[in-house]
Amino acid sequence: MRVVLGLLLLTFIYLFYSHAKYSNTGIDITDEAFHYFLLQSSKPGLPFIVYGNLFGPIINLLDLEIAEIRMLSLTTHLLCGLLLAIAVKPKISKTNNYWSPIYTIFITFTPLILYGIQGRFISYNSLTFCLTSFIISCLIFSSVHRNQIKSYSLVFISALLTGIQFGVKFPTFIILFILIILTILFCFRLTNLIVFLLGTFIGIITVHKNFNIFQIFNDCKASLGEYGFAGFHGSESFLDLYLNSLYVQFLQAFTKLDIIIVICTMLYIKRTYILNSIIVTFLFCYLLFRSWHCSYFQSGESAFFCATPWFLAAISVITLAFYYHFKRIIIFKRNEVFFLIILFCSPFLCSLGTNTSLIKQFPVYLTFTSALIVILLCKMPKTKGSFLLPLYLLIITICVNYNSIYQNPVRTYPLDQISNEPRNSHAGNIRLDDSDDQIISNILSYIDLNSKPGSYLPYIDLAGTPGTYLFINKERDFPYYGQWLDITSTSRLERLFSDLKKSSKTKIFIHCRQDWSLEKFGSFESSKKIMGSNLMVGLFALKQ
């Protein structure tokens, strides 16, 4: 165990060293650019309002640049995972002594998936995760505190954060709000409910800067209809998009029954015979082999599909927990059941509120699933394979994000593999050492081609990517991001691109590619067809 912990510590140190080394290299001109340029919508109710109202002024005041924000984001993600682990530990320690340091590291490191497969900034996905992690942690801390003043204070903090969540993802807020209300009604004093309702109201009006709660709800409802039902992925509604993608995720999980059987067997072996130790080690190696064979160990965009091992692990652990509960070997208290339900639902409810399918959103919130798995493992009788399951999932976490966390500043191929020569893609690369006229001409051409019905070309500015807005000298009006640019955002934009051009001679270019990585996982037919293979990313990369 000490050897394992030592290796994980070295991995953690190397993570920060390597990330700091390239944190000032390149920028993703899609999601990351949106947050770096502090874009704000003039329309109320959109899910970006929290970032603009709360974090924009802080970034402006401190004049944080891309490197500082990236490192701050990495630290924030890991601290939120650590907080959840710290909150879960005392709750578990009251009933057993099975807590292992590997569990703390496991929960702490899983936010790397969220950080690794999106823009490196604290995006609204990150805000959703951080807020939900803090909310659940505060509620768990409150449930173990006997001091009423501390308990009320923790409930009030969770309520404030829930109100802020209202301005990040409205559907997530609704379901989370209902789950917390039910938890308080059945597991806390009734006075906690009053504290929670008051704190939530204060959180909502703080973010929206509006005391008219009914107007706020109307704005969110209107923006949800406009923003969500845009026909992305071939779906006409959130419900159609979510249910069909969820069906695919579960279908992928249940087609790998051998892994479920292996996990259940590994967790059931209790004896310390040498033969049993050999069997458990063999099963652990089999899990790693199957994960490699099933293409779980991916990088970049393919890392979206790293959720399958967590599905399989959660299914296995929950099944065994029910078995032990039925045999009266373990007993679940009422408040434990509610917290387990919240942790189980959190990856799903945090995924709601965007026009992205659950099959892509679920993996970024696996920290909650990791906490669920750890709690159930600690409740069940200790076995030879108890700590190996989190270790297995932790290895997958590092492997699927190795490329993006340790080597790349943005979501593209490793920088040492990218050249100025066009790659085998529909678009190739747009080199910044070309003439300005040639760059503008190429970008406009790709925009026109991608705007045609049925196009599968990599997009540069389908929704108004800020980087494109600068390159084409603001010659076009863009439907979303472009029209949100103000003096502050354009000055940050121009300063960044100017600095990057000065620091490199001929190695700066826009790398554009069509991502067909989803094809290997298949597609399916339903009332609507979700075209997973049309994921397109335009990236601005600096090769050193």
PLM feature spans:
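Extracytoplasmic catalytic/substrate-binding loops of multi-pass membrane glycan-assembly enzymes
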Residues: A20-Y36, K43-I58, D63-A67, S235
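Aromatic- and kink-enriched transmembrane "portal" helix at the membrane-lumen/periplasm boundary
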Residues: I66, R70, T95-N97, I107-F129, ...
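Transmembrane-helix motifs of polytopic, lipid-linked glycan transferases
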Residues: M71-N97
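Specific aromatic-rich, kink-prone transmembrane helix
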Residues: L127-N147, L154-T162, T369-L372
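Membrane-interface alpha helices of multi-pass inner-membrane proteins
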Residues: Y152-F170, L176-L182, G199-I204, L343-T354
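Short periplasmic/luminal acceptor-recognition loop of GT-C membrane glycosyltransferases, typified by
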Residues: F170, C399-D486, T506-Q514
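Membrane-lumen/periplasm interface segments of specific transmembrane helices
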Residues: N192-R271, F289-S295
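Aromatic/acidic, Gly/Pro-rich catalytic loop(s) in extracytoplasmic/lumenal soluble domains
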Residues: S504-Q544
